């Protein structure tokens, strides 16, 4: 059989393929009964089988011959992974090394056997005379692995340190720093590694001594624990074809390491294992070389090298034969693999060639020529044309604006502010604002106006005109509410605004709101209306007069567009179309506007326009549209008429494309595109609308088309096909009568003159004055828009339905002779004037230099000063006592128990926009200040502070680029880093680099269960893993002994179930991640803490320190000068806590990845508060951990306030922290709670627009990560210490909801915060009068004074009784005078404390929470908590829902109170009422307030300095972290048991 195979292969290679003869030879001449094919599949045997069936089957049956044909699957064993590893390794320099074998010297004679083998494999063989070979280094003497080294390695890996950093003189107990969980984990590993050899209390024995103790009886090899670590390292970090056996073989051949030295080597490799799997041979080689370098350095040895030897003696030849034989076998095996590959390739090529042969030639030619029309089209039309016709219309991206009823409240608030001023500057704004309010007025806004008037009367406005103005607007609103909104043309050049004073405005509003505008001329000048005929433009006096009347009416009475549907194309920034849109919305029109620049910036511009000008009933629909695309034209018309209520009344096709600098000789694809936009597709658009009206039978409502004509009929030149496009539109007027669409469209041509400030005319604005000097009139864009809007709202529109009309707003431009030349002269004059001015300036400069000298000039320029960036904390501005506090003091002084008043003294946050300061900048303005940019750039690691010598050797103190180490001037930071900062902050597309485990929603990992259909190659594993595999898979796994001790070969068989990773795409791709590059290490937090704790704890640590600094605290132990250690509490909460640790505990542990042994503790929600206390405070106070989903922070505030009011604490940290991880994001998405970001993108929304909780289009919330912390203290303590006070927490409450089945459903339980008996709002009753008297602050003050008189009487009586008792004691000889004096002092102290307690209780009962008195609560919590400070519900100036930033213009001190509400999944309704700090200052005297200011000033300066130094030095948090408790260890019990213990001598 072997001979047959060799002959067959020789025959096949020696001659052209003669397979038919070969078959006949095997089946006929040789009569072979068994035919075996060696190859990848049954290729040849199948062919032979068919031949046998056709020619030999009947003969064989007659002769009784039974033939069988065997393919590879019938005779081959399944591929074995270990064998494949050996096969690949044998072809390399050393077994697993990916290097070619050494060259063979041409003088070495190979053996006969070797030559024969080469011939049989088809490998060309030379006849060398001599071989030079690398001799592996000699095997080094084996030494056992020291036990102390194993112990150090185990401890180092648990501590996330290098073993070199572990001193053998230290004990394990000292190294772990008291972390009991970590201690137990290490001890468990020791017992597993050295079973039966671990002494008692090993944690208290130095590592060196521990190693000596456990080395007795140790075999010098790796134990169970370290062997498992080595195996995991190899299986997870080495390439798939590298098992432990191949690694050990490599170490032996490369460096001569014996087994125990290999153990030491591998243990070192475990410690220094790479972060990710090594994928290339070079990376494996480099990794092992690096480990070898360090290993031999530790052993004090040089790295052994293979020696090259030329072998000529017989002895060496014998040694060479073994090496060469191994290589030859590798060559043979490699050749066999190549043969198999070539057979497969050949078969594949045959199939491909056959397929190609069956393909018709004309098909190939057609595919070859398919690109020719495309190339021709691009050549003809050009790239600019191709790019300009790309469709962009998408109905899903529509933006709808219709909430005029909401924006009016902003207008009314602005009206209240403006009407207070008594100057002419506010008059124009006041009139325009009044118009907008009248156009938007509704019942809800009337209530708002009425309330504003009432408040103005109550507050006693200093400006009496203020109330009259508001009253006038209110009375006018009552009239206009029943009328349609109107557009008033206030932009004409023929009208002026006359200020008649507020009195004049008030009286005019009573008569007519628009009498402030007085026309100078009744008729507009030079605006003729007519029609185009064969003889040209013919003026119609009748129509001209009609238009003049309409213009006059638009300026005096106004025009309305209620019920009109309008389509506008070409309403970009500063355009005429945008001005028309503004007027249409003012008049109540429903408008569709298209834009070819559909960005968040554009949509925001239109939203702001609607907010300002949208009137009652008006609607604005914004849609992306490219008028250069026929697809978009069709899509737009079909989209509009899907809703027949939007049948169009007006079409304003003003989209245009500028064509500057294109003459007849250089018309290009841009000119063709412009012609398509301004003519071809404009006509198609009109045709589509006409077609839709016709198909729906709409013949009584023709749409009026305002065609944009131009007086420029080529008179300016160099404008491409612009003039041709405009002139061609005039032909449409003739087609109105000659074609059949006159019932559906009416035409009005508008000759648009020189309009300043538009995009098309921007370059010509500088010569507009010269044009007017030539006798033509130029227009502003608002003025032109006003005239066009008047055309639409006047009587001319009706006339257009009879015949097309043309309105000449050209301003006489076409009458100027030689306009082109005169404009050129004007430009030339401007250039000459500019050059003359430059020459004069240069002459003056030279004269200055000649007088003062060049040196002084350089000095002047070199001393330019730039402001330096100062990173500092922001503090609340303290109010003036006489102006802001004294008016309140009369009623509030000493009215409340300040020990139970809760105030906020500090706060901080870490979130998508950085901290609270940078977030405020971005949410207020959308831009960053230089300080804000520098702070974020530092936070993201883009810059760092440097003090020292710069690259050029000069001393430097300032900012440095973290990457290039280049010095960065302060004034360059904003321009250099702002774009990068904005790109990687805020709500944005998820960045996998900063996600836990590199989560990428584009490739979300999951596992797919698969049942094996065939056996897999074997892989190497430890005996323990092999046993686990057998336990799981049973008879579907085969285990055999491996090539090294303790290793097994495991083969999964067909039928075994495995899980295979897959990556899918998840549609939640946007989140609010913290700024990219944020690192806790930048704040000085040590690697040990970073490795130990969960990220949420790191967030909280940083925020806590910044909150302390915001509170003016530079050392946490300063608290204990004023309070006991049990009076500092922590109520920081979270909805899920350490999500990153939770994921590791479940997923990574399941996948057998390295996980800390104490990971469980980091998943507890209260662990964050515990770490803060252990690292910063050392408090013995309460830790309470609220869990309230989205309402967690308000629940925390509620819990903290309760602790202080109940006197269980005097200082409480409150807030919440959340992380963003893959699993929670997926589950929120599954329950449709978060917005589908892909759907949002389809609707044209950018990431920063996806979180919009107050919008009607809200489609779910957007997840984010970060932390927010507040410091709460009692008001008494804050005033005593001089802490900044940001607000008073007047009331907090949590509310559940009714029966239901939906956990996330928002409830109405917070309404209970307004609970009170119904009759308190009704007619007066005895009960009602009593309840209302409690709300009166003056009445309660009288009651409190009466109670204080009683307490004073109690003190007097108690002192009298004490004197009597002392007298009796003095008569008793059993007591010494010292005893009596001590007794007297104790009793006096008791009387004083009791009086203070009673007075505090009285103030609390009649001040803080008077509204809780009685079994039947008569006053609602909201009403009562405000009344305690002399306020009512109308004093709540700001209401924030779910914590969104609100920008409040003007004087922030005008805000008296605010309400914050939030709702969390699981019926967590919450509300908090906050009050301005000046009300607290009104409860103390002026002297006390001045003392507070002095303390506050010193404290804030110190905190600002600490903050700046922390950023500069990179130790902002680390300087706060404590190593010891605030008291000596031996005094711990005394401090815990004695409530009077305080920290003394604190500096």
Curated annotation (Swiss-Prot):
It comes from Cochliobolus carbonum (Maize leaf spot fungus). Belongs to the thiolase-like superfamily. Fungal fatty acid synthetase subunit alpha family. Keywords: Fatty acid biosynthesis, Fatty acid metabolism, Lipid biosynthesis, Lipid metabolism, Multifunctional enzyme, NADP, Oxidoreductase, Phosphopantetheine, Phosphoprotein, Transferase. One of its GO terms (molecular function) is holo-[acyl-carrier-protein] synthase activity. Residues 563-798 are annotated as: Ketoreductase (KR) domain. The genes involved in HC-toxin biosynthesis, called collectively TOX2, are organized into a diffuse cluster that spans >500 kb. All of the known genes are duplicated or triplicated within this region, with some variation in copy number and chromosomal location among different race 1 strains. The active site is at residues 1190, 1442. Residues 109-118 have a biased composition (Polar residues). Residues 145-221 form the Carrier domain. One of its GO terms (biological process) is long-chain fatty acid biosynthetic process. InterPro entries: Acyl_Trfase/lysoPLipase, Fas_alpha_ACP, FAS_alpha_su_C, FAS_alpha_yeast, FASI_helical, Fungal_FAS, Ketoacyl_synth_AS, Ketoacyl_synth_N. Residues 1004-1476 form the Ketosynthase family 3 (KS3) domain. This is Fatty acid synthase subunit alpha. SUPFAM superfamilies: FabD/lysophospholipase-like, NAD(P)-binding Rossmann-fold domains, Thiolase-like. Its cofactor is pantetheine 4'-phosphate. GO terms for cellular component: fatty acid synthase complex. The modification O-(pantetheine 4'-phosphoryl)serine is found at residue 180. It comes from the Eukaryota. CDD domains: elong_cond_enzymes, KR_fFAS_SDR_c_like. It catalyses: acetyl-CoA + n malonyl-CoA + 2n NADPH + 4n H(+) = a long-chain-acyl-CoA + n CoA + n CO2 + 2n NADP(+); a fatty acyl-[ACP] + malonyl-[ACP] + H(+) = a 3-oxoacyl-[ACP] + holo-[ACP] + CO2; a (3R)-hydroxyacyl-[ACP] + NADP(+) = a 3-oxoacyl-[ACP] + NADPH + H(+). Disulfide bonds: none annotated. Fatty acid synthase alpha subunit, part of the diffuse TOX2 gene cluster that mediates the biosynthesis of the HC-toxin, cyclic tetrapeptide of structure cyclo(D-Pro-L-Ala-D-Ala-L-Aeo), where Aeo stands for 2-amino-9,10-epoxi-8-oxodecanoic acid. HC-toxin is a determinant of specificity and virulence in the interaction between the producing fungus and its host, maize. TOXH contribute to the synthesis of the decanoic backbone of 2-amino-9,10-epoxi-8-oxodecanoic acid, an essential precursor for the production of the major forms of HC-toxin by the non-ribosomal peptide synthetase HTS1. Its EC number is 2.3.1.86, 1.1.1.100, 2.3.1.41. Pathway: Mycotoxin biosynthesis; HC-toxin biosynthesis. The keyword Lipid metabolism applies. Residues 94-121 are annotated as: Disordered. PANTHER family: FATTY ACID SYNTHASE SUBUNIT BETA, MALONYL COA-ACYL CARRIER PROTEIN TRANSACYLASE.
């Amino acid at each position: 059989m072997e001979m047959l195979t060799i002959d067959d292969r020789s025959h096949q290679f020696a001659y052209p393929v003669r397979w038919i003869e070969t078959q006949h030879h095997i089946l006929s001449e040789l009569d072979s009964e068994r035919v075996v094919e060696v190859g990848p599949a049954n290729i040849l045997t199948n062919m032979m089988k068919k031949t046998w069936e056709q020619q030999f089957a009947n003969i064989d049956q007659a002769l009784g011959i039974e033939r069988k044909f065997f393919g590879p699957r019938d005779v081959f064993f399944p591929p074995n992974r270990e064998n494949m590893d050996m096969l690949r390794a044998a072809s390399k320099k050393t077994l697993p090394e990916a290097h070619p074998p050494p060259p063979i010297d041409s003088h070495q004679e190979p053996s006969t056997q070797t030559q024969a083998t080469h011939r049989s494999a088809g490998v060309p063989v030379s006849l060398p005379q001599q071989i030079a070979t690398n001799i592996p280094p000699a095997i080094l003497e084996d030494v056992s692995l020291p036990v102390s080294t194993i112990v150090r390695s185990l401890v180092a890996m648990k501590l996330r340190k290098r073993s070199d950093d572990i001193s053998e003189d230290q004990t394990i107990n000292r190294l772990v720093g008291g972390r009991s969980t970590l201690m137990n984990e290490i001890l468990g590993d020791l017992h597993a590694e050295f079973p039966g050899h671990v002494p008692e209390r090993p944690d208290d024995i130095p590592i060196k001594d521990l190693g000596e103790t456990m080395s007795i009886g140790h075999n010098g090899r790796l134990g169970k624990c370290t062997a498992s670590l080595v195996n995991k390292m190899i299986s997870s970090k080495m390439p798939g074809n590298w098992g432990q056996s191949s690694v050990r073989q490599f170490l032996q051949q490369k460096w001569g390491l014996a087994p125990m030295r290999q153990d030491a080597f591998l243990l070192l490799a475990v410690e220094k294992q790479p972060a990710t799997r090594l994928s290339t041979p070079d990376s494996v080689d480099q990794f092992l070389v690096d480990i070898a370098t360090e290993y031999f350095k530790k052993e004090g040895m040089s790295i052994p090298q293979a020696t090259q030897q030329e072998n000529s003696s017989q002895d060496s030849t014998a040694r060479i034969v073994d090496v060469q034989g191994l290589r030859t076998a590798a060559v043979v095996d490699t050749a066999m693999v190549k043969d198999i590959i070539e057979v497969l390739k050949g078969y594949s090529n045959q199939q491909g060639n056959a397929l190609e042969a069956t393909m018709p030639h004309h098909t190939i030619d057609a595919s070859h020529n398919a690109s020719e029309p495309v190339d021709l089209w691009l050549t003809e039309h050009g790239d600019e044309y191709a790019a300009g016709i790309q469709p962009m219309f998408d109905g899903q991206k529509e933006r709808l604006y219709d909430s005029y009823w909401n924006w009016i409240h902003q207008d009314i608030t602005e009206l209240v502010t403006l009407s207070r001023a008594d100057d002419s500057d506010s008059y124009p704004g006041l009139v325009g604002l009044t118009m907008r309010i009248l156009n938007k007025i509704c019942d809800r806004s009337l209530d708002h106006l009425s309330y504003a008037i009432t408040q103005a009367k109550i507050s006693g406005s200093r400006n009496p005109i203020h109330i009259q103005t508001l009253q006038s607007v209110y009375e006018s609103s009552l009239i206009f509410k029943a009328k349609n909104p109107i557009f008033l043309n206030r932009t004409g050049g023929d009208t002026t605004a006359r200020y008649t004073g507020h009195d004049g405005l008030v009286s005019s509003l009573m008569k007519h709101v628009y009498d402030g505008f007085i026309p100078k001329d009744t008729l507009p000048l030079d605006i003729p209306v007519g029609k185009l005929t064969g003889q040209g433009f013919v003026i119609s006096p009748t129509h001209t007069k009609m238009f003049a009347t309409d213009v006059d009416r638009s300026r005096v009475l106004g025009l309305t567009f209620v019920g009109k549907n309008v389509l506008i194309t070409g309403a970009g920034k500063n355009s005429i179309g945008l001005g028309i849109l503004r007027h249409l919305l003012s008049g109540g029109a429903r408008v569709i506007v298209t834009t070819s620049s559909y960005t968040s910036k554009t949509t925001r511009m239109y939203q702001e326009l609607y907010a300002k000008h949208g009137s009652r009933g008006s609607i604005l629909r914004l849609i992306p549209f490219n008028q250069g695309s026929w697809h978009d034209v069709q899509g737009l018309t079909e989209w509009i008429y899907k809703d027949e209520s939007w049948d169009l009344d007006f079409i304003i096709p003003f989209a245009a494309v500028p064509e500057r600098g294109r003459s007849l000789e250089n018309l290009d694809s841009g000119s063709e595109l412009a012609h398509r936009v301004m003519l071809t597709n404009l006509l198609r658009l009109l045709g589509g609308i006409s077609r839709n009206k016709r198909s729906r039978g709409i013949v009584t409502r023709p749409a009026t088309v305002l065609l944009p004509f131009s007086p420029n009929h080529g008179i300016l030149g160099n404008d491409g096909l612009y003039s041709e496009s405009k002139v061609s539109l005039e032909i449409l007027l003739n087609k109105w009568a000659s074609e059949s669409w006159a019932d559906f469209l009416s035409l009005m041509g508008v000759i648009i003159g020189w309009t300043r400030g538009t995009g098309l005319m921007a370059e010509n604005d500088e010569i507009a004055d010269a044009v007017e000097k030539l006798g033509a009139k130029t227009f502003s864009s608002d003025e032109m828009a006003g005239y066009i809007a008047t055309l639409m709202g006047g009587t001319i529109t009706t006339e257009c339905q009879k015949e097309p009309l043309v309105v000449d707003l050209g301003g006489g431009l076409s009458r100027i002779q030689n306009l082109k030349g005169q404009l050129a002269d004007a430009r030339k004059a401007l250039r000459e004037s500019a050059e003359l001015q430059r020459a004069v300036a240069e002459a003056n400069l030279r004269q200055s230099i000649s007088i003062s000298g060049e040196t002084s000039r350089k000095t002047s320029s070199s001393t330019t000063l730039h402001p330096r960036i100062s990173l500092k904390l922001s503090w609340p501005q303290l109010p003036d006592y006489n102006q802001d506090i004294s008016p309140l003091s009369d009623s509030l002084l000493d009215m409340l128990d300040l020990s139970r008043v809760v105030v906020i003294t500090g706060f901080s946050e870490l979130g998508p926009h950085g901290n609270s300061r940078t977030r405020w900048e971005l949410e207020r303005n959308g831009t960053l200040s230089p300080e804000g940019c520098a702070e974020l750039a530092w936070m993201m690691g883009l810059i760092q502070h440097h003090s020292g010598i710069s690259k050029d050797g000069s001393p430097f103190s300032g900012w440095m680029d973290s990457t290039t180490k280049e010095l960065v001037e302060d004034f360059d930071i904003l321009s250099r880093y702002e774009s990068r900062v904005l790109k990687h902050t805020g709500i944005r597309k998820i960045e996998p680099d900063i996600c836990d485990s590199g989560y990428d929603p584009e490739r979300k990992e999951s596992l797919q269960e698969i049942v094996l259909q065939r056996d897999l190659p074997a892989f190497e594993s430890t005996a323990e893993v092999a046993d686990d595999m057998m336990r799981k898979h049973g008879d579907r796994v085969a285990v055999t002994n491996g090539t090294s001790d303790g290793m097994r070969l495991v083969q999964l068989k067909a039928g075994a179930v495995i899980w295979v990773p897959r990556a899918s795409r998840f549609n939640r791709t946007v989140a609010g991640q913290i700024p990219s590059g944020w690192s806790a290490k930048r704040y000085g937090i040590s690697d040990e803490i970073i490795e130990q704790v969960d990220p949420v704890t790191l967030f909280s640590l940083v925020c806590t320190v910044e909150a302390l600094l915001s509170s003016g605290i530079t050392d946490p132990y300063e608290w204990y000068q004023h309070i006991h250690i049990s009076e500092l509490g922590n109520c920081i909460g979270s909805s899920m806590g350490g999500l990153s640790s939770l994921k590791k505990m479940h997923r990574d542990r399941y996948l057998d990845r390295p996980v800390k042994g104490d990971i469980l503790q980091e998943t507890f929600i209260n662990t964050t508060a515990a770490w803060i206390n252990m690292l910063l405070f050392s408090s013995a106070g309460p830790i309470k951990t609220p869990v309230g989903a989205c309402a967690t922070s308000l629940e925390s505030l509620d819990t903290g306030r309760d602790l202080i009011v109940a006197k269980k604490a005097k200082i409480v940290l409150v807030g919440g922290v959340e992380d963003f991880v893959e699993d929670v994001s997926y589950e929120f998405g599954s329950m449709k709670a978060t917005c589908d970001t892909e759907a949002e993108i389809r609707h044209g929304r950018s990431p920063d627009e996806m979180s919009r909780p107050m919008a009607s289009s809200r489609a779910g919330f957007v997840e984010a990560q970060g932390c927010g912390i507040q410091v709460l203290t009692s008001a008494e303590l804050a005033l005593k210490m001089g802490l900044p006070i940001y607000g008073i927490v007047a009331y907090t409450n949590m509310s559940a909801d009714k029966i239901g089945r939906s956990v996330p459903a928002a409830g109405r339980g917070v309404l209970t915060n307004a609970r009170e008996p119904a009759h308190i709002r009704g007619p007066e009753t005895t009960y009602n009068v009593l309840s209302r008297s409690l709300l009166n602050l003056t009445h309660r003050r009288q009651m409190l004074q009466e109670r204080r008189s009683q307490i004073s009487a109690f003190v007097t009586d108690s002192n009298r009784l004490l004197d009597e008792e002392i007298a009796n004691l003095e008569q008793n000889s059993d007591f010494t005078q010292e005893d009596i004096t001590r007794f007297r002092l104790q009793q006096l102290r008791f009387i004083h404390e009791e009086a203070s307690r009673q007075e505090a209780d009285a103030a609390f009962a009649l001040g803080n929470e008077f509204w809780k008195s009685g079994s039947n609560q008569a006053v609602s919590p909201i009403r009562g908590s405000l009344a305690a400070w002399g306020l009512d519900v109308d004093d709540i100036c700001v209401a924030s829902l779910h914590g969104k930033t609100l920008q409040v213009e003007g004087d922030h001190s005008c805000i008296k109170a605010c309400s914050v509400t939030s709702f969390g999944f699981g019926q967590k309704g919450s509300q908090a009422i906050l009050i301005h700090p000046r009300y607290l200052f009104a409860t103390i005297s002026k002297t006390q307030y001045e003392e507070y200011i002095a303390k506050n000033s010193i404290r804030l300066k110190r905190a600002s300095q600490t903050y700046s130094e922390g950023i500069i030095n990179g130790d902002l948090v680390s300087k706060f972290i404590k190593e010891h408790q605030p008291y000596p260890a031996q005094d711990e019990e005394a401090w815990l048991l004695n409530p009077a213990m305080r920290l003394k001598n604190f500096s």
